[in-house]
Amino acid sequence: DYYDMLTGQEIKNRDFALMVMDSRGRVEDGNVDFINKKDQSFPFGISTDYDKLKEETKDYYAKSDLLMVNLGDTYRLDEYKVNLNSKTYSRMKYRVYNQISDYIEYVFKMAGKNDTIYILGSFPSKLDYANNRRLAPLVRFDMSDTGKGLLLSSTTRRVGVFANLDMGVDILSRFGLKNSEMVGRPLANKAMANRDDYMAKEYKKIVAISSIRMSIINIYVAVISISWILGALALWQRDKLPKKHKKNILNFLKEMVKLGLIMPLAFLSAPILRPGSQVQITLAIVFMTFLLYILGNRLFKNDDLKQVGFFSILMILLIVIDSVI
């Protein structure tokens, strides 16, 4: 719960309950309304009642196979941040996370060796979201496993990165259950000692790609649109083109159309160079574009149809390989 800062109206958010509802919207057991208390040292003067939460966690843990807990303090903190200076925000953030840390420690002491604990980090703040840092962290603790590493699924086929659709499937798989209507995949473990450094580098790449994606797509659409429109106009009015430059104009437009075929190939093949920043990604795409263009011209010199066929076959092969690996 929190208060709308424009209207002052209290907002009751119960979206989290959707995760444990049955097909008719019913929650078998739990507390979705009376778990907060008034505390002026917390955002909006509202705090999770952690003493009550601990008691109810212990009670529901004893009689339930699956227990989900949503802590609203982190969400309220992000919503309330605009009202705070940096010093006050830091103090309030410490207070919030100190309580959460104490609660998580309590849960770990209570958990048995056959339990699995999922800790889903809070959704990215508004600032992080604006800066394309849009992934929420998930940590899975298998209480019987002392190793450490990263999670992966066949949905993304990328170590440390998976879809939110996979979480529900993985929880069901812990009970030996399957739901035919779920499209996610169970999560697997990959042992890795340097997981933190690895994920920091991978996340940097993900943010870089997200930040530059729309610019690349816009450039691609512009190249395709301009080349096809100009090409169509040139063919339509070819008799009116200056005879001295007619051949050069048509050849240039023809190469522009081929460039439209090459650019998607460059997007797909650029990761081979392992770029890690926006500048490196841009340079990798430009390099692969020129490389593929020169390769096609050298292999099938003066044969445009074979060049188009070559680029098309390469595209099909890359898509097939990407879907298999």
Listing of model-derived features with the role each one plays in the protein:
Residues 1-212:
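Soluble extramembrane regions of membrane proteins in the secretory/endomembrane system
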Residues 1-86, 222-275, 284-325:
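His/Asp/Glu-rich, glycine-adjacent segments
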Residues 194-237:
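Acidic, Ser/Thr-rich low-complexity intrinsically disordered segments
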